[in-house]
């Protein structure tokens, strides 16, 4: 029997009753969220409210224990191929602008295109410099 996806029409990201615990601490409690293509969202809340954990679960840097996360029609589950496809397409901005503080901004911007998309260093740097020129 095939599983029916309940993702709202054209949703880019859907979280359905997502739960996450750190030991006994229930950090994400039945989170439901729908993000449409092109929509920008901001997760606001006090320290410890689950903002970063939610973002990390969407990119499967953290594993949620219950519920469903669907990104562009791809359900995040144990299938590593699904996780890799989502990581290639989903960009995230964390609380700190540099993911790897020991690296330059340029190296932070080129590491994913080079390692995940197998772009040459020159191509990745060219794209990064074009993007930096916009800010």
Per-segment meaning from a language model:
Residues 68-85:
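ABC ATPase NBD Q-loop/coupling interface
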Residues 59:
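Helix-to-loop junction immediately C-terminal to a conserved catalytic motif
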Residues 25-26, 84:
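Short coil-to-beta microelement around the adenine-binding A-loop and adjacent beta1/P-loop entry
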Residues 102-112:
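Short coil-to-helix segment of the ABC ATPase nucleotide-binding domain corresponding to the Q-loop/switch region
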């Amino acid at each position: 029997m095939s599983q029916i996806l309940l993702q709202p029409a054209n949703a880019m990201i859907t979280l359905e009753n997502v739960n996450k615990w750190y030991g006994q601490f229930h950090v994400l409690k039945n989170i439901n969220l729908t993000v449409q293509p092109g929509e920008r969202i901001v997760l606001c809340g006090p320290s410890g409210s689950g903002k970063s954990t939610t973002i990390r679960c969407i990119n499967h840097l953290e594993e949620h224990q219950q519920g469903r996360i669907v990104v562009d029609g791809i359900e995040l589950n144990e299938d590593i191929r699904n996780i890799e496809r989502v990581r290639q397409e989903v960009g995230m901005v964390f609380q700190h602008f540099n993911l790897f503080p020991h690296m330059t901004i340029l190296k932070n911007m080129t590491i994913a295109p080079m390692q995940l998309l197998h772009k040459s260093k020159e191509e990745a740097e060219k794209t990064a410099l074009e993007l930096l020129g916009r800010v």
